[in-house]
Design a protein with these regions (language model features):
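Solvent-exposed soluble domains appended to multi-pass membrane proteins
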Residues: 214-217, 231, 236-434
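Membrane-interface segments at or immediately adjacent to transmembrane helices
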Residues: 141-228
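Alpha-helix initiation and N-capping motif
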Residues: 55-58, 172-179, 196, 250, ...
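Residue-level preference for non-acidic, small/hydrophobic
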Residues: 61, 226-231
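N-terminal post-signal-peptidase region of extra-cytosolic proteins
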Residues: 72, 209-213, 247
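Transmembrane and membrane-interface helices of multi-pass
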Residues: 1-165
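Short alpha-helical interface patches
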Residues: 46, 55-64, 177-187, 192, ...
Length: 434
């Protein structure tokens, strides 16, 4: 009932806003089909449903980039959906032409006050459209607000919210319901005893502790140039249960780890959610501290913040506004990075489509993504530019070579034969090999 109510309110709003039954039916059918296809593919790739924040990819002009992520195994599904939409549009348009009732509610904008019928019709037309949008908005916001009347009604009718686990919520309540419930985002619940006095007390406490820890230290981190590299979907495969190789897949990294300071990171996501890990690495803020409805800070939080904090600002404070630079060998608007990195204070974000684009954009064999070696060269160029400067800097790199979907891109892939893992599905083996 909860899922039906959400879809019914959307359909009703379309009918009353357009005042055309068949046009609204066409828009609703096409939108629902596109939503279903996109949701299915995203679940397949990321084990996540479509959320409202994903619409920023479309509004930001990233539709083409998103389509490049569609796996070949889903292409037939996409083609079938396109054929369905074409036939559905033809049928809906034909019915619109054949049906003599062009308007759902009688109104006349050309002669609004010609007679009582037109006056009443126009008033009712406007009120119905506004009321339908208000009802839909109230329903959507109520689903995401515990304690609201809508929330209580939904709970009484089988709604089982799991906003901390979007895929679980979608499976339990329907993807459309999950989408609507996330339309209102509350970044964080207000902690008990939260006040300016409390925060100043905490700041003083940890400043004193930091002073004690650093008492015997002569240098500062900002005395050095720091490069933060977030390697797309990188991990040590030999640590994954059930995965085995006849040769070491990361000998160079393992050698570096054995000869210098190194360690392990507990990641909140594996094989996806890169932007969330990136946000947490840059800010030090754990997503566990936020409200369950905040799923992607880069899309839902940072663009709306006035002065968000990030670690690169420590270098900016000491060396000026040009002390931090970022590199991402893909489109700048993906996850709104162009907006977010500007908010963080980075002097420039070099991407494939930035005003000053990246020079090193080579790919390996048939891979569609810029190789890691090319991305590293972009960072080395920034270091070379700094040689004559007495200032240190913070450099941020987010790579793309290992981004999904995975394909048979590489001619000399020794890991395909070296994979001696057992009890793997065909899909798992393919992902590991490629």
């Amino acid at each position: 009932l909860v899922s039906f109510m959400g879809l019914a309110l959307i359909y009703l709003a379309l009918i009353l806003v357009t005042n055309r039954f068949w046009i609204a039916t066409l828009v609703f059918g096409v939108a629902l089909t596109a939503f279903g296809v996109a949701n299915s593919i995203k679940v397949q790739l990321r084990n996540e449903p479509i959320i409202p924040a994903d619409l920023t990819f479309v509004s930001g002009g990233d539709t083409g980039s998103i389509m490049s992520f569609v796996p070949k195994s889903s292409q037939a599904f996409v083609n079938g959906a396109i054929n369905f939409v074409i036939w559905f549009a033809i049928i809906a348009f034909a019915l619109f032409v054949l049906d003599g009732r062009r308007r759902f509610i009688h109104c006349s904008w050309r002669h609004p006050i010609a007679n009582a019928k037109n006056i009443i019709g126009n008033i009712f037309r406007v009120l119905a459209a506004v009321l339908s949008v208000v009802l839909l908005s109230a329903y959507a916001m109520g689903l995401g607000t515990p304690g609201s009347n809508v929330y209580k009604w939904a709970k009484d009718n089988g709604y089982e919210p799991q906003l901390w686990n979007a895929i679980g919520d979608a499976q339990a309540n329907n993807p459309a319901t999950t989408f609507l419930s996330l339309s209102k985002v509350k970044a964080m619940d207000k902690p008990d005893n939260y006040s300016q006095k409390t925060m100043q007390s905490l700041a003083k406490k940890y400043a004193q502790e930091a002073q004690a820890i650093n008492h015997t230290r002569s240098g500062e981190l900002t005395d050095n140039t720091v490069i933060m590299i977030l390697s797309e979907t990188f991990s040590d495969p030999t640590r994954v249960p059930g995965v085995s190789f006849s040769l070491d897949p990361i000998p160079n990294i393992r050698n570096i780890k054995n000869t210098t300071t190194s360690g392990l990171m507990l990641s909140p996501g594996y094989g996806g959610g890169t932007a969330n890990i990136e946000y947490q690495a840059l800010t030090g803020l754990n997503l566990a501290n936020f409200n369950d409805s905040l799923i992607v800070p880069y899309q839902q939080l940072v663009p709306n913040q006035n002065d968000p904090y990030s670690f690169n600002q420590i270098w900016m404070k000491k060396y000026g506004k040009n002390a931090s630079t970022a590199v991402h060998p893909f489109q700048q608007s993906m996850y709104l990075r162009n907006i977010n990195y500007r908010k963080f204070g980075f002097s420039y974000l070099y991407t494939l489509d930035s005003k000053i684009p990246l020079k090193h954009t080579g790919c390996i064999d048939r891979s569609p993504y810029v190789s890691d070696s090319e991305a590293y060269q972009s960072i080395l160029d920034l270091l070379d530019r700094q040689q004559d400067s007495k200032s240190s800097q913070f450099l941020q790199l987010v790579t793309m070579q290992n981004h999904m979907p995975y394909g048979d891109y590489y001619d000399n892939n020794e890991f395909s034969d070296a994979n001696i893992s057992e009890d793997l599905s065909d899909g798992e083996r393919w992902n590991i090999n490629t």
